[in-house]
UniProtKB/Swiss-Prot annotation:
It comes from the Bacteria. GO terms for cellular component: cytoplasm. This is Uncharacterized protein CCA_00454. InterPro entries: HBDC (IPR022390), UbiD (IPR002830), UbiD-like_C (IPR049381), UbiD-like_N (IPR049383), UbiD_Rift_dom (IPR048304). PANTHER family: 3-OCTAPRENYL-4-HYDROXYBENZOATE CARBOXY-LYASE-RELATED, 3-POLYPRENYL-4-HYDROXYBENZOATE DECARBOXYLASE.
């Protein structure tokens, strides 16, 4: 179904009992997000809240809360569409063959924007700018305020005019000011930097849209010179209608519920945060640019789209998977040494990436690894797992086992200190600063991996288990652990990888839990420990085990958790929200 129309999508999901209308009064401060979290945890339907306290507009959440629903929403996109494009680009057809590719060529004609000359603009202007009229959510008890959680932030480069549509959370500061949480390696932040270099404000337009293709495109890691609007229109198969406005150089998209027009203020910063983010922890308060809102448009029957982020699985996980499904065929074209590539949403995407690569000559895998770490937002990858063995990247235990049976640590373990880091990842010494590691397992297997620890007792270890062959998980505490004693323990030398955790049962409950608890809680430069006997040719002679200290450190932000008052309130009112269920 072509579900760029939010109202048609809502009607269809309602008819399939995959959307529930909630008419009970609900507070956008903590209560609504807690309802949402319980529903998405149980793979439940989309939610349309009609009676949000203090607001004139209904709130839609959990639109992307299951993989099945995401697949249905984007089912108009033909399977194999991107591979067809790649084939067409790599082998341009002869004139006589164009008819065979007519559907793809017609889709190409749908790219971009179309000025709506005869369509009435479906929005009206808010009498005066008042951001308090929007039902912004406070999702977690220690959040610094209410946030736009699905804003589509449109900017243009002051020099080239190349546009960017990105998704950056926006905290409400007052009736006409929002924060601009521009993260590194994102286009909006690049444009703001350009504007400040010229001592100018940056025109910014914020769309709140229920068009799934716009939302998906806004989170796509596209090259800086490719517009997200092109991807949106290519996937949905139709142009986006727009009109001009005298108060902004930007197009106003008809496919929006709300449109906020304003600018990022040059050289002005406001304390932004904390905010419980998609890593599952609070991102802390830092100074970020401010957006001054000059005008607000909204549909007469506007629906406010929102999402809640936190520990996986949330809506961003399912959207991220769909996006990787579409974009993964492009990786071998952009990076010829790559066969497959996947970033793991269970670890916040940027914390962990796996790749199957080619090894057509000695250490081609290293060249490809560096190519991956130099490619756009992939440059924020913290751990990169590489093999040339054909393995299903969706099966992370198998990928890790494949690498551990092949890795030669003094050759295939590479650590980079003093690198950039995802803005939301606090494992490094400062904001946006961190480190990286590459694990490579190339060629045939060279060892049999242990499945169970059979050695002597380990100092200050209270429990242990295996995640996969070759990976031993040890339960301990930060206060008790003795890293050197573990590295030098003779009975651990046969284990390529050892992981430290506070709670073994929680960590080994599932692959999702292992990924989240392991890779969101360590920095390679400070928390990856390994022995080496000497340094030769500027390389340490590493020996097993490689130890990952994934214990919570004192400087890490807290995990996001709902407060007890809200938990009890939602439990008490549950039948009010869902009287028919």
């Amino acid at each position: 179904m072509a579900m760029s129309s939010l109202r048609r999508l809502v009607s269809l999901l309602r008819s399939q009992n995959d959307l529930i209308d909630i008419f009970a009064p609900v507070d956008p401060y903590l209560e609504l997000p807690e309802i949402h979290r319980r529903v998405i945890e149980n793979q439940g339907p989309a939610l349309l809240f009609h009676n949000v306290q203090g607001a004139s507009f209904p709130v839609l959440t959990n639109l992307f809360g299951t993989q099945k629903r995401v697949d249905q929403i984007f089912s108009k996109v033909p399977k194999g569409l991107i591979p067809q494009v790649i084939h067409l680009l790599s082998s341009p057809p002869k004139l006589s063959q164009l008819w065979k590719h007519r559907n793809l060529l017609l889709r190409g004609l749908s790219l971009g924007l179309r000025k709506a000359r005869f369509l009435k603009f479906p929005h009206k202007k808010m009498a005066s700018v008042d951001l308090h009229q929007l039902p912004m959510l406070t999702s977690w008890p220690e959040d610094g305020g209410a946030f736009l959680t699905l804003p589509l932030v449109y900017t243009e480069s002051p020099s080239s005019k190349i546009p960017n549509l990105g998704m950056y959370r926006m905290q409400r500061f007052d009736r006409d000011t929002l924060g601009l949480h521009f993260q590194i390696q994102k286009g909006g932040g690049m444009h703001f930097y350009e504007a400040e270099q010229k001592n100018e404000n940056l025109p910014v337009t914020v769309f709140l849209s229920g068009n799934p293709f716009l939302i998906l495109s806004a989170i796509a890691p596209l090259p800086e010179n490719i517009s997200e609007l092109l991807l949106c229109t290519f996937l949905q198969g139709s142009k986006l209608h727009y009109k001009n406005d005298p108060d902004t150089p930007h197009p106003l998209l008809y496919d929006s519920e709300f449109i906020l027009i304003g600018e990022g203020i040059c050289n002005e910063r406001r304390p932004e945060g904390p905010f419980g983010d998609h890593f599952g922890y609070y991102s802390l308060q830092h100074d970020f640019p401010a957006f001054k809102c000059r005008k607000i448009y909204h549909r007469k029957d506007a629906i406010y789209p929102a999402t809640i982020v936190g520990k996986p699985y949330q809506e961003d996980f399912y959207l991220g998977n769909k996006l990787q499904e579409y974009l993964s065929p492009l990786f071998p074209m952009v990076m010829p040494g790559v066969r497959q590539l996947k970033s793991y949403g269970e670890a916040g995407f940027h914390a962990l990436t796996g790749a199957v690569v080619k090894e057509r000559y000695w250490k081609e895998s290293l060249a490809t690894s560096l190519r991956i770490l130099g490619e756009g937002q992939l440059s924020l990858t913290k751990f990169l797992m590489i093999t040339d063995h054909h393995v299903d990247l969706d099966n992370f235990p198998k990928l890790l086992e494949t690498i551990l049976s092949r890795i030669v640590p003094e050759r295939d373990l590479i650590i980079f200190s003093e690198t950039s880091n995802d803005t939301l990842d606090y494992t490094g010494p400062k904001l946006n600063k961190g480190s990286k590691a590459i694990f490579m397992g190339i060629g045939p297997a060279i060892r049999d991996l242990p499945h169970k620890y059979r050695g002597k007792s380990l100092p200050n270890i209270t429990n242990m288990g295996t995640f996969c062959p070759g990976c031993l998980v040890l339960e301990t505490t930060l206060q008790q652990v003795n890293i050197d004693a573990l590295l030098n323990h003779p009975d651990l030398s046969s284990w390529p990888l050892v992981v430290l955790t506070e709670n073994l049962n929680e960590t080994l409950a599932s692959s999702k839990d292992f990924l989240w608890k392991t890779f969101t809680r360590l920095a390679p430069a400070t928390d990856l420990h390994v022995r080496f006997s000497n340094v030769a040719h500027h390389r340490p002679n590493y020996t097993f085990p490689i130890l990952l200290n994934s214990l919570m450190k004192p400087h890490y932000p807290k995990e996001v958790e709902a407060d007890e008052t809200t938990i009890q309130k939602v439990s008490h009112r549950w039948n009010e929200y869902f009287p028919k269920y």
